[in-house]
């Protein structure tokens, strides 16, 4: 149902007002069999309870000088509320209440006096007077300004003089400087001599001796032509293996060194790589300052022949040992440069290896250890080459046996 239909079906307000005025006589109103005694019944002196002696405080009452009709409110519609309800007095059987006042032992709280009088600032406390600078003491002049002269006209661009050292405190002796510790001498200057009596400390001459001139050596290159810097290429070896092979030692026809797979790789046009100047590889745990020698081993049916190049070595500085358990030949010693001490100080290029050397060569193949006569080993040093001969007791007859699974 729409709102318009509801408005059409709802009875008008005049109908409801007529029903209220007529009461039970209205045709649409039916009397209740048991009427409510507490129901509000509009009457001049009734509040809603039958027999109440006081008028209702909520009923509209006329104002002073207003002639409105309380029944139908013909003039105006009681725009102002009713006057406040007067106190009816105590209930029946109760005496009127009277304020007893303050008890005799407790006087009323007096109003503070300081709030009645205007507040005035008392000033600082007696023990807290405002500070007044008395000025400098009689025996102490004021601190002068470092930038202004005494007459106040000429400025000074320098600060005041430093405060002098007052000396040690009371009860303390002056600390004498004992000097340098006997076991810790002052570090000498490398640019001045130790003699402090002369006046040549300002010359700046070095106290350490001058080293002989050595041209710069580019790492990992060789000598090309007669001029330029002499580039050095030390040989790189792998310990425990023999160098060379079917191609032999030295330089090949295409211009690069014939090396095995254990050597440092080289460029095919003869220019070695930069990392070819690394020190020889040593296994972990093997630390020795002696360098490895290049050896040639010849295996003949009668003996093993080993050639070791030792240029500049002497017989008394070379030692050859034989280990029968490991079937290993050991060669060690030292190689030095001939000449006087003064000549060795003037060296300008050192490409030859000198110093201690050590090399161990294991004889035989992987099949079995060869049978050699350790008492008949001979060695000789001729033309800078050490020749060691190890004779065999039996010819090599190694047979390969087939194992049946």
From Swiss-Prot:
Q: Which PANTHER family match?
A: HEAT-SHOCK PROTEIN 20 FAMILY MEMBER
Entry function: SHSP domain-containing protein; part of the gene cluster that mediates the biosynthesis of the tetrahydroxanthone dimer secalonic acid D. The pathway begins with the synthesis of atrochrysone thioester by the polyketide synthase AacuL. The atrochrysone carboxyl ACP thioesterase AacuM then breaks the thioester bond and releases the atrochrysone carboxylic acid from AacuL. Atrochrysone carboxylic acid is decarboxylated by the decarboxylase AacuI, and oxidized by the anthrone oxygenase AacuG to yield emodin. Emodin is then reduced to emodin hydroquinone by a yet unidentified oxidoreductase.
Per UniProt, the ranges with Low complexity bias are 206-219
Source organism per UniProt: Aspergillus aculeatus (strain ATCC 16872 / CBS 172.66 / WB 5094)
Residue numbers spanned by region Disordered: 1-252
Q: Give the record's keywords alphabetically.
A: Stress response
Where in the numbering of this chain does the sHSP domain appear? 286-405
Chain intervals with Pro residues compositional bias: 175-189
Family statement: Belongs to the small heat shock protein (HSP20) family.
Polar residues: bias regions:
1-11
Which Gene3D superfamilies would you find in this protein's record? 2.60.40.790
Among SUPFAM superfamilies, the record links this protein to: HSP20-like chaperones
Report biased composition (Basic and acidic residues) as residue ranges.
63-77
Applied uses, from the record: Secalonic acids show unprecedented anticancer activities against various human cancer cells and might be interesting for further derivatization, targeting diseases such as cancer.
Q: What is this protein called?
A: SHSP domain-containing protein AacuJ
Q: Which InterPro entries match?
A: A-crystallin/Hsp20_dom, HSP20-like_chaperone, Small_HSP
Stretches with biased composition (Gly residues): 242-252
């Amino acid at each position: 149902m729409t709102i318009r239909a509801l408005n059409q079906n709802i009875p008008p307000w005049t109908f409801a007002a007529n029903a209220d005025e007529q009461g039970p006589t209205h045709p649409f109103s039916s009397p209740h069999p048991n009427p409510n005694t507490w129901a509000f019944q509009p009457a001049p002196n009734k509040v809603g309870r039958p027999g109440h002696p006081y008028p209702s405080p909520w009923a509209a009452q006329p104002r002073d000088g207003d002639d409105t009709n309380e029944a139908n409110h013909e003039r105006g519609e009681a725009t102002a509320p009713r006057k406040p309800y007067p106190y009816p007095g105590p209930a029946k059987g109760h005496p009127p209440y009277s304020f007893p006042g303050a008890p005799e032992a407790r006087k009323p709280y007096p109003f503070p006096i300081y709030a009645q009088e205007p507040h005035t600032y008392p000033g600082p406390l007696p023990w807290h007077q405002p500070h007044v600078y008395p000025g400098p003491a009689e025996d102490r002049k004021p601190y002068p300004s470092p930038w202004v002269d005494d007459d106040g006209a000429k400025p000074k661009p320098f600060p005041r003089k430093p405060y002098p050292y007052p000396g040690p405190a009371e009860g303390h002796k002056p600390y004498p400087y004992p000097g340098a510790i006997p076991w810790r001498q002052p570090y000498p200057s490398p640019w001045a001599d130790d003699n402090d009596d002369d006046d040549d400390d300002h010359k700046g001459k070095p106290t350490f001796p001058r080293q002989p001139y050595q041209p710069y050596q580019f790492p990992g290159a060789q000598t090309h032509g007669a001029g330029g810097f002499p580039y050095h290429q030390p040989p790189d070896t792998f310990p425990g293996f023999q160098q060379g092979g079917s191609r032999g030692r030295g330089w090949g026809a295409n211009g690069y060194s014939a090396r095995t797979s254990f050597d440092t790789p080289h460029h095919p046009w003869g220019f070695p790589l930069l990392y070819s100047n690394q020190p020889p590889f040593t296994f972990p745990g093997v630390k020795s300052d002696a360098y490895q020698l290049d050896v040639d081993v010849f295996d003949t049916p009668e003996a093993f022949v080993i050639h070791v190049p030792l240029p500049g070595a002497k017989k008394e500085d070379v030692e050859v040992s034989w280990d029968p358990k490991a079937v290993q030949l050991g060669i060690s010693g030292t190689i030095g440069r001939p000449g006087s001490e003064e000549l060795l100080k003037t060296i300008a290029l050192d490409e030859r290896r000198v110093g201690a050397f050590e090399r161990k060569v294991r004889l035989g193949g992987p099949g079995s250890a060869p049978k050699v006569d350790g008492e008949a080993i001979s060695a000789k040093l001729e033309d800078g080459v050490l020749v060691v001969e190890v004779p065999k007791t039996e010819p090599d007859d190694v047979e390969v046996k087939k194992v049946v699974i």
